[in-house]
């Protein structure tokens, strides 16, 4: 019997995971990366992280690079959910498992999808606005990229919930590529026609920052109900300052940790763990899905959820006000 001396000297080969990220411009993806990599390393895996720089062609090249490097699992935070199916097919043909992380890759039959309940995000956004805005109030919707599957799900949840109120959506726009700066132009345009707006639904907290800046320039900051999502530090600061009403908080630590655990298990066992029992459609296929719940964070519960939960420090959240008197 021949002994593999390379194996004896080098030790067991580590699991190799490729993580391709849309862009690190949005604050939350940095936290996703850090928790994912740390968890995978704790489990004995190595992670090759690639930044697509908000470029779909670059992300496709990164997936092909991972295939060439014989990764065991590829995890994709998609730039364009509708443009990666052929790259995923090439990975599958090479025997590599693929996970859609937070954004579903459309029509690709990825091995798993892990995200938050994006429809629920829309629901709690609408519920928060319904609680804070008088009947008949006018609302703007400044959403994320139309190429992001999650945007559609958030919109569905928002609009379906809003049907139970007298609030009126009078203006809609999408920030293509999740370019938050576009929101400033949209809101300026909308305010010209609807200066009496009562609420603005924002695709994420980054977009909300641009919206609130324009509201401030028009002496409306704090008077218009603004909601976003992600629990960014700046958004939490705005909430305690009174210029943003709510952020749909999603525990990035839980999402990234579980995604890393599933990636390692899939590499070790060659199949999906048995505790993933739900499915979601990617447009053509029903994909095994793990869906986490978001939480509406307002001034009333920000200390409990964000600070006590360890997501941001109290001195950071209350940086711009005297929190000792709160």
What are the residue ranges of the model-derived segments?
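A residue-level marker of the well-folded mature domains of exported/periplasmic proteins
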Residues: 1-326
């Amino acid at each position: 019997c021949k002994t593999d001396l390379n194996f004896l000297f080098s030790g067991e080969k580590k699991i190799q995971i490729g993580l391709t990220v849309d862009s690190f411009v949005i604050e939350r993806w940095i936290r996703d990366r850090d928790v994912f990599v740390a968890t995978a390393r704790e489990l004995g895996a190595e992670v090759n992280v690639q930044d697509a720089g908000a470029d779909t062609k670059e992300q496709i090249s990164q997936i092909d690079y991972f295939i060439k490097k014989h990764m065991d699992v590829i995890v994709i935070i998609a730039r364009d959910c509708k443009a990666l199916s052929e790259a995923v097919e090439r990975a599958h043909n090479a025997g590599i498992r693929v996970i859609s992380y937070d954004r579903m890759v459309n029509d690709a039959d990825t091995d798993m999808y892990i995200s938050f309940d994006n429809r629920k995000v829309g629901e709690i956004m609408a519920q928060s606005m319904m609680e804070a805005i008088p009947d008949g109030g006018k609302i703007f919707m400044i959403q994320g990229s139309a190429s992001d599957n999650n945007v559609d799900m958030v919109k569905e949840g928002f609009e379906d919930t809003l049907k139970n109120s007298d609030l009126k959506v009078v203006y809609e726009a999408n920030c293509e590529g999740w370019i938050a700066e576009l929101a400033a132009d949209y809101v300026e345009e909308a305010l010209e026609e609807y200066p009496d707006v009562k609420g603005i639904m924002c695709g994420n907290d980054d977009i909300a920052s641009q919206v609130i800046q324009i509201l401030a320039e028009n002496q409306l900051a704090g008077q218009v109900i603004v909601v976003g999502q992600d629990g960014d530090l700046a958004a939490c600061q705005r909430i305690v300052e009174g210029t943003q009403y709510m952020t749909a908080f999603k525990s990035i630590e839980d999402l990234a940790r579980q995604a890393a655990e599933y990636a390692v298990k899939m590499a070790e066992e060659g199949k999906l763990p048995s505790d993933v029992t739900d499915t979601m459609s990617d447009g053509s296929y029903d994909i095994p899905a793990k869906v986490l719940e978001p939480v509406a964070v307002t001034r009333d519960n920000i200390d409990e959820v964000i600070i006590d939960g360890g997501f941001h420090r109290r001195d950071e959240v209350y940086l711009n006000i005297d929190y000792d008197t709160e």
